[in-house]
UniProtKB/Swiss-Prot annotation:
This is Tubulin alpha-8 chain. Dimer of alpha and beta chains. A typical microtubule is a hollow water-filled tube with an outer diameter of 25 nm and an inner diameter of 15 nM. Alpha-beta heterodimers associate head-to-tail to form protofilaments running lengthwise along the microtubule wall with the beta-tubulin subunit facing the microtubule plus end conferring a structural polarity. Microtubules usually have 13 protofilaments but different protofilament numbers can be found in some organisms and specialized cells. InterPro entries: Alpha_tubulin, Tub_FtsZ_C, Tubulin, Tubulin/FtsZ-like_C, Tubulin/FtsZ_2-layer-sand-dom, Tubulin/FtsZ_GTPase_sf, Tubulin_C, Tubulin_CS. CDD domains: alpha_tubulin. GO terms for biological process: microtubule cytoskeleton organization; mitotic cell cycle. The record marks 324 as: Involved in polymerization. Its cofactor is Mg(2+). It comes from Gallus gallus. It comes from the Eukaryota.
Length: 324
């Protein structure tokens, strides 16, 4: 930090499931909040999945870390290991994806999100601008990331994808970094980050087509605007990697109520173990209290409720809110 002339903020990469990724990150974020209160903190958090599970207690760690970092983090991009795993298998024909395969794909996404800080473009956006556009309420700060095109070199050799094709692909759940179904949720915000050989005219046409074709529902208190960034630097790939070198790509960041499905899945797994107090003694032995578990779980229940509430129409009368 001392070497920086104009520090904008911190990017923190961690997993939810492991002890270090969850525990140490929580401590680190708290320290950063104390020492650099005004600087923004963005997380890239790896959400646990059954395919590449490292610990039985992943649901505990995930809930505990989400609770402690919820107040500290300005924006968190969740990456669901299962979603990445499936993309590698389906789009890249990798039968048994390794961490390297998964990480290269995640790297591509991080690169897209930070491209606007690093290169020039027609419609450039910086880190703070994302937050302003994507985070309507402090707690609702988990955008869904979708990336396209994810194709292997063999496939790309035969086809180059147009702006409208890659834009359309962003609305396919199979290209999302978290398994959830936005068709069942409502959007609060939507940012499209294009890079490479892309002109505004094509983007406008692609988005107009999406608005007419797709049933994209925005919450009624939000204008149905898509924020667009265009960056002229085409995506680069790791030499000899899985991903094809393409002329244009897009990364979509959307804040949708559908991502609450991910919390619901974790909460359910937490509940199954916690009902039996399984494995809790290990945490208590390290100086934690059982109360911290229920406190964290209640906070997550409140988060699910927050998502439910932002999705309900603001026109509904007060009395109707009682039923839930």
């Amino acid at each position: 930090v001392d070497q920086c002339t104009g520090l904008q903020g911190f990017l923190i990469f961690h997993s939810f499931g492991g002890g270090t990724g969850s525990g140490f990150t929580s401590l680190l974020m708290e320290r950063l909040s104390v020492d650099y209160g005004k600087k923004s903190k963005l997380e890239f958090a790896i959400y646990p999945a059954p395919q590449v599970s490292t610990a039985v207690v992943e649901p505990y760690n995930s809930i505990l870390t989400t609770h402690t970092t919820l107040e500290q983090s300005d924006c968190a991009f969740m990456v669901d290991n299962e979603a990445i795993y499936d993309i590698c298998r389906r789009n890249l024909d990798i039968e048994r994806p390794t961490y390297t395969n998964l990480n290269r794909l995640i790297g591509q996404i991080v690169s897209s999100i930070t491209a606007s800080l690093r290169f020039d473009g027609a419609l450039n956006v910086d880190l703070t601008e994302f937050q302003t556009n994507l985070v309507p309420y402090p707690r609702i700060h988990f955008p869904l990331v979708t990336y396209s095109p994810i194709i292997s070199a063999e496939k790309a050799y035969h086809e180059q994808l147009s702006v409208s094709e890659i834009t359309n692909a962003c609305f396919e759940p199979s290209n999302q970094m978290v398994k959830c179904d936005p068709r069942h949720g409502k959007y609060m915000a939507c940012c499209m980050l294009y890079r490479g050989d892309v002109v505004p005219k094509d983007v406008n046409a692609a988005i107009a087509a999406i608005k007419t074709k797709r049933t994209i529902q925005f919450v009624d208190w939000c204008p149905t605007g898509f924020k667009v960034g265009i960056n002229y630097q085409p995506p680069t790939v790791v030499p000899g990697g899985d991903l094809a070198k393409v002329q244009r790509a897009v990364c979509m960041l959307s804040n949708t109520t559908a991502i609450a499905e991910a919390w619901a899945r974790l909460d359910h797994k937490f509940d199954l173990m916690y009902a039996k107090r399984a494995f809790v003694h290990w945490y208590v032995g390290e100086g934690m209290e059982e109360g911290e578990f229920s406190e964290a779980r209640e906070d997550l229940a409140a988060l699910e409720k927050d998502y439910e509430e932002v999705g309900t129409d603001s026109m509904d009368g007060e009395d109707e809110g009682e039923e839930y």
